[in-house]
Amino acid sequence: MPPMLWLLLHFAAPALGFYFSISCPSGKQCQQALLSGNDILLYCNSSGAHWYYLFTQGKKGRLTSLTNISNMEIMPEGSLLIKDPLPSQTGLYHCWNKNGRQVVQYEIDFQDVTTLHITHKDLGQRPLQNETLHLGSKQLIFTWWEPWQDCNRCEEPGECKRLGYRYIEEPLEEAMPCWLYLGEVLVWSSRLRPELQVEACHVQCTNNTQLRVDYVIFDNFRLDEKTEFVWLDCPLGSMYRPVNWRANDTPLTWESQLSGQDFTTFLDPSTGGRQLQVFQPAVYKCFVQQELVAQFKPAASLETLEAQWRENDAQWREARKALRGRADSVLKGLKLVLLVVTVLALLGALLKCIHPSPGRRSTQVLVVK
């Protein structure tokens, strides 16, 4: 992606204003599976809060004050923003208020989004099956599905998606997100993968899902000369929100991509379609929660500018010819009017000589020889 476009896009999202967040009741401990590579806000309503963490993968450690991790930021109101989280950052996150009392505790499993298994129900594609793991006793590996997200379009056919996380359950115990359960145990399985499932939808429009934000226009994207493609990034788009792209007002769908019908664009599964790879110039629009948030116009190429200049020059020449023709017609018309006025003036003078004005008597002289 061109540096300037990347910069604009990444400054646009904070300006527009919010990240997807999860919350936990004050004083409680909450367990949650999420996806790596997708920004998340861990809510803690305590101004001046301090955060402590313990990553559970790798060697044992202890709670450490969160001060210098590059992709984490404590927000003014106390919440913790984690940008592009890594699978290795799976672990415990504690929020303490400025008086040294724990406010909330999160146990987060950042499951590896690069191994995402994506399926479309309308194409007959099947999600991952359950599997048995043997670690001293039998553990069941299964997918825990989140509710379906809202349809990404309304009043016309759209698509909706849902996320699935791999959980492990053993007899008489509650199920846990797999990597929180495994901790330091190194296990490989082709079924220890998060899932994304898509299906068609058709709903009426409501105001309940709208973001109510102004949209942004970017009008200078170019395809890379070497790779011949560019990545577009939809502000406010997220794996956790419904996203929809259109190319010249034609919807881009997961169904077309997963069935191999569309090779001009590529919706990135690891971002839930927030990022779009394009291989040809067009006007691209992205919608989040059914609302337009950004429009991308291609920068004009040198050939296009030259063609436009030639077209404008030809139009100017034609306009000048037409103007010159109209000017000649007007001049001829003026000459004709002037001739008519002159003739009428002469006729008027002649009539005055032939018929004197009433009330004035003429002197007549009779000559007799």
From Swiss-Prot:
Q: Which InterPro entries match?
A: FAM187A/B (IPR039311), Ig-like_dom_sf (IPR036179), Ig-like_fold (IPR013783)
The membrane topology of this protein is: Single-pass type I membrane protein
Q: What SUPFAM superfamilies is this protein classified in?
A: Immunoglobulin
Instruction: Give the transmembrane region(s).
Output: 336-356
Q: Where is the signal peptide?
A: 1-17
**Cellular location of this protein?**
Membrane
Q: Which residues are glycosylated?
A: 45, 68, 130
Family per record = Belongs to the FAM187 family.
What is the name attached to this protein's record? Protein FAM187B
Q: Supply the source organism for this entry.
A: Homo sapiens (Human)
Its lineage opens with: Eukaryota, Metazoa, Chordata, Craniata, Vertebrata
